[in-house]
């Protein structure tokens, strides 16, 4: 017996006549579809959180990141979080493109994204080491983060490393 499978998430939502023996839910399992009209009917279920591991005060002229990719134009507070391109937050999010949320406020990535960490400008955010950082979650969509770096949520979500601890919460 031949099993026919032709559709991914977008196909399932748009081409009901081609839903043969199987379909591939794919990215819709995360609550995304890469189609704004379809996304209205989906609920994102993924949250990616970490903590601030270090905060450093730097002075105007100091540098941050590989190859001194950020040279501070003013005094700044820089937070380091233990997430980097080895975990799926790739280098495209570096140098002010990507952002995460600290205390509900946007904190932009400064410098290059490193293997196991990245740095954030938290100059305007009252925070401390150990505070929670939301990379993706409620009010911090994968779509928005991906768009900030000119990519799509599918690339971000499927690129998350299996080394990230996962917890499934029912309900």
Regions found by a protein language model. Name each.
Residues 4-171:
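Active-site anion/phosphate-binding pocket segments in diverse small-molecule metabolic enzymes
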